């Protein structure tokens, strides 16, 4: 049980790190793809809501 719990915990951190790290890296590099796409989506969603 302890090993399984530890494995799940590590997997969660790793998955979160990969997803978050990728976005931060891309956005920091100048929004090559992820950052740029996110900004465009947010900008397009705001006017649609209004």
Curated annotation (Swiss-Prot):
S-S bonds: none
Entry keyword Iron: no
InterPro entries, alphabetized: Celegans_Fungus-Induced_Rsp (IPR052889), Fungus-induced (IPR024415)
Keyword field: Signal
Described purpose of this protein according to its UniProt entry: May have role in hypoxia response.
PANTHER family in UniProt: FIP (FUNGUS-INDUCED PROTEIN) RELATED-RELATED (PTHR39380:SF2), FIP (FUNGUS-INDUCED PROTEIN) RELATED-RELATED-RELATED (PTHR39380)
Descriptive protein name: Fungus-induced-related protein 15
Organism name: Caenorhabditis elegans
């Amino acid at each position: 049980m302890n090993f399984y719990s530890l494995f799940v915990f590590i997997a969660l951190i790793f998955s979160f790190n990969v997803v978050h790290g990728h976005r931060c890296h891309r956005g920091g590099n100048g929004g090559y793809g992820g950052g740029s796409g996110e900004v465009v989506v947010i900008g397009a969603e705001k006017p649609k809501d209004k």
